[in-house]
Amino acid sequence: MYNASEKRYENMLYNRCGKSGLKLPAVSLGLWHNFGDTAPFETMRQICFTAFDNGITHFDLANNYGPEPGSAEKNFGRILKEDLGQYRDELIISTKAGYDMWPGPYGNWGSRKYLLASLDQSLQRMGLEYVDIFYHHRMDPETPLEETMGALAQAVSSGKALYAGLSNYDGETLKKASAILDELRCPFIINQNRYSIFDRTIENNGLKDTAAELGKGIIAFSPLAQGLLTNRYLNGIPEDSRIMTDGRFLTKDALTEERLQQIRNLNGIAAGRGQTLAEMALSWVLRDGIVTSVLVGASRPEQVLDDIRAIQNLEFSKEELAKIDSVSL
């Protein structure tokens, strides 16, 4: 039987999620990779234990995380049932719906039909009565925003979610969605978007500024650019790397000679700060207080500990930020 460390809250930093009452750990655990049916179950357990023992209270999922879709929720549900469930009131569990999940016109995008059915399925897979945060996973070009936001509000009012979130939205759509959710008196508190030194889309599409203006939190996924912003690729592509073993999200084409040189230059800046490249990359995302938390993935427990070290040095000089920009933009 798992017993959590009594010192689990001693070293983690917790940030308020926008203007809400909810605080999230500066580092959260994402189950996008490594929690599907192809991963060893015992490794998943140890990753979750290491995370929680070190103050990571937030576990982020989606209906389609796997492989196969749904398997990450199912595996996490088993960990909850066997081990972590006794700590449910100390956990922030999120899930999402928005990508293709089942055949036909009702298993994708942003209709009320799809979102509420998907949430019920997610709760069943995880063995939960509610999730803490329920996200719409991506903007839907066809469904009226009022319908999608209405579904999020219904999820909360029904008691199946405590808060609503939006993922992969831009600033303009965020502003419209937020106004609708305000009218519905729905506690919308957080945006989840890709953000890293190599991907600054949210700085350019208005999402980051709008979230700050509206008092909404941001949680950043892929802050290590799928592992590129680590020491993994400093000397080329290892045989056991994600590029070689799982080409779904990161391909050889992503590691050009120019990109490799950028990684090496950034590694030099990190060394000057007394950090690893991964630590600096995570610190950079958290640098100005607008991003509430960074989502990290892990294929083994030690990686979780490595990532948590980023919070020990979140300060950057103007010179360091300028150097990072000069070698990465």
Which residues make up each language-model segment?
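Hydrophobic faces of well-ordered beta-strands that scaffold small-molecule active sites
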Residues: P25-L29, F59-L61, L91-T95, F134-H136, ...
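Short, acidic/polar
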Residues: T38-A51, G110-M126, L174-S178
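Alpha-helix N-cap and loop-to-helix initiation/capping positions
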Residues: A39-T43, S71, N75, Y106-Y114, ...
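Beta/alpha (TIM)-barrel catalytic core signal, keyed to glycine-rich beta->alpha loops juxtaposed to Asp/Glu
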Residues: Y2-E6, T143-L329
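N-terminal small/glycine-rich loop or linker at the start of catalytic domains
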Residues: G18-G36, S94-G107, Y130, Y135
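N-terminal binding-site loop/beta-alpha segment at the start of enzyme catalytic domains
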Residues: M1-L91
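Acidic-and-aromatic substrate-binding clefts and catalytic sites of carbohydrate-active enzymes
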Residues: F35-P40, N64-A72, D140-P144, G171-E172, ...
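Active-site groove signature of glycoside hydrolases
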Residues: L123-T143
